[in-house]
Each structure stands twice: as C-alpha cells, then as structure tokens.
Amino acid sequence: MNKLTAIVLKGFRKIYSKFTNKNSHNFICETNPERASEMIYNLLCNNKPCMIARFGSTELNAITNYRGIKNHKNQVLNFIMNKTPQWWWNEKGLEEIFSCSGFFPPTTENVSRFAEMMITDMPQVDILGSWRPEEKFFSKELAHASKIELEILNPYWSKKPWTRALANKKILVIHPFAKTIQAQYAQREKLFNNPEILPYFELITIQAVQSLGGNDQFNNWFDALEWMKQEMDKVDYDICLIGCGAYGFPLAAYARSEERRV
C-alpha cells in the first residue's frame, strides 16, 4: 500500500467516523456489576469447562488487521465506512504487539499464525469482557459468548463478588509476578474489607514468560506458549486465573479444551 494512499484512506475514515459515530463501542453488554458477578459465579460453579476472557488492545488490533488483509482486500468504501478492517499491514501495529504485548519476533508470518490461532480459539469464550469496537469484526466467532463491560470483570465492584466461587478450590495463577502474588495472598485477610473478594483456596502459581524485556530463553513466542502449556499440564487445578499479556487468551483456550474453568 502506497503510504500517501493509506494516509488519505485513514483520513476519510476518521472524518466519516467523527460525523457518524461509527467507531464507538456500542455493543449490547451487561453493565450492572451485581448481575455480571452472578453470571460469572454461576458459570464457575456449574463444574463444566468454561472460559471468561478479554482481548488485549494490541493483540486485537493485529488480529483485526490480519482479517482485513485476508478477507477484505481493496474494499475502499467499506473501509471508509468502518465496515471492514484495514487490508494492508499496519507497521505500527506490528511494533506494538512486540513492545506492548511481548509477541516475538513480530514478522507478518508470525502475526498471521497468531491471528489464525486466536480466531480459532474465539468460539471457546463463554463470557467476554467487552471494550473494543474491533470486536464487531468477529461477531460470528463470538456469537456464543455473553458480554459484560470489561471493568466489572473485577470482583470488587460487586457486593457479592464472583471470586467467592474460588473458595476451597485448587486455583492455578499464571502471571509474571508469581512470587509477589504468593506473598500477597499470605496477607489476604488484610487486603479487602469484604473477605469474599479473596477467600481461602489452595494457591498454585506458574511464573509466566515475560518477553517484553527481550527474553531470549525461547526462539519465538510460540515456543514460549508451548512451554507454559506443558507447565500447566503438570498441575492439578480446578480453576485457572491468567494474566500474562498475549499469552493469556491462548492459554485460557487451552485450559478450557482440557476441561478446565478459566
């Protein structure tokens, strides 16, 4: 794509969106924290595999970009009207999925492979923390998912937090700051006024790969992902809580495919 042409097309799209509000996030989703908390709680308590997830910003940008390239090439008018995604590679987006989400190396081949994997995993989502307008480009894949406003995924907004479902369970947490989480959990009774926000459970942790800082332990992001899957397979757990950048969504889908709740 010629750089000048890309600038002009994006300019027209921006003007169109400004006057029509077509780029706003206006999906129907649950905004009441009590109802949202009950939805999550009930899902976690029915003892069936489930996946509660959200998209990262840079990851979804890259996936959307890939979908535009694959399915919507040269659809100028639809692009301007924000009906289809950008159909040429966004160089800034490729940089950001590396610098902000730790995906490496951010080649178009690797990002294409990542996008295909993410799109394949999307139908496994049962509840989606919704916040990005680009979600509309994946309405078919997400048709099964109930949507709640992203912020109220956090349990502390509800008087009856969904985290009470964790009580007396084996809880696996995958996060780069695993040791800090263990130390904080030891002080759990001092952290919140409502004890149901962080009840007693058996805490198991896996230190996630932190590839934002140029971790060279693995040849690529996919190798790091496979290593974390293998670490998960070594653990007996009931529910998994994951917070590890671009690795999070695929690991959650893997846990669900293994008949777990995440």
PLM feature spans:
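A short, acidic, amphipathic alpha-helical segment used as a generic capping/interface helix at domain edges
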Residues: 35-39, 111-113, 223-235, 247-249
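Electropositive, gly/pro-rich neighborhoods at or near active sites that engage anionic ligands
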Residues: 3-200
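Short, catalytically relevant binding-site loops at active-site mouths
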Residues: 178-181, 210-213, 247-248
